[in-house]
């Protein structure tokens, strides 16, 4: 028989209280779910990792299944423990990835801090995918420099004085290279080897290399004033620059590697640095570099040469100044020089000498003019062959 009426209402009250408490627990769980979801969204927005999206998807699907069973079947599953466990797993994985990324950034800063500008390092740290440590072929500009007569300079100084002078010089030069986002490859005694266009792409690599070379020569002028006042030896730097396809990357043994470059275009830059002595110049660039940077620089055409180790002739230029910034009487010197070069190419060596000497009246120490006066005199005594192509063959590296 049904329970007496006076028993029904207490039973109904107990049942209503239980259902109300159950619904309250559900609401608490739903609030917890929302909190977890908000935290998950925050993690995704901050870390932007694919793994976080997977965790978020798991949380959403699990919550949707629970809501479905509660609405249509009256079943309530525990949301708190699985979702908290899922979220803790996500935090653990992200902490691991964070530590891994931090280790990678520390490696990048340690590996490149000595020869990359801080701005370039920051770019690589923000996007390590831009850095390829394996060998790759890039369009780049290679730079070589060497101090003229450094052996004589070193013999006049004590070891301590020599190291102090060299450190002062190298620091000043490398500051300029870094300011133009160049990469210092290595030092070989007093020589500096650097490049532009790696590890990050730089469409203006030739221009930046030329601008850096010009500023480095300006720094040398300032340094020589200081050295003269301190009664220390003067330093004059020869530089060679060439652009083109170059192989660059981490090279070496299994235990010791360097981020460096190699290739024919690198070798040509080294040859041009040494070739300065034949023209009594200090900064020489190849035709490839000139074509890429001609809108930003003033140059003097020097010669068509065949350097040691290369069969193809190369046009070479003296890098003089930034565009429209020629100093003193150089513009007038160049006018006489160009007339002399036209005579030289047409085998009119006497007329060529006259024009070169007119230039020397303005700049008595002009290296290329002195070089061509001597060469024209040589050809007057020993004329070139009838099939002469105008190419001058170097018989030594310089």
Q: PLM features: residue spans?
A:
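Intrinsically disordered, low-complexity, charge-biased linker/tail regions
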Residues: 385-398
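Cytosolic regulatory/linker segments at or just downstream of nucleotide-handling modules
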Residues: 246-248, 277-346, 357-358, 363-368, ...
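Transmembrane alpha-helices and their extracellular/periplasmic helix-loop junctions
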Residues: 25-115
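Membrane-proximal helical linkers
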Residues: 102-134
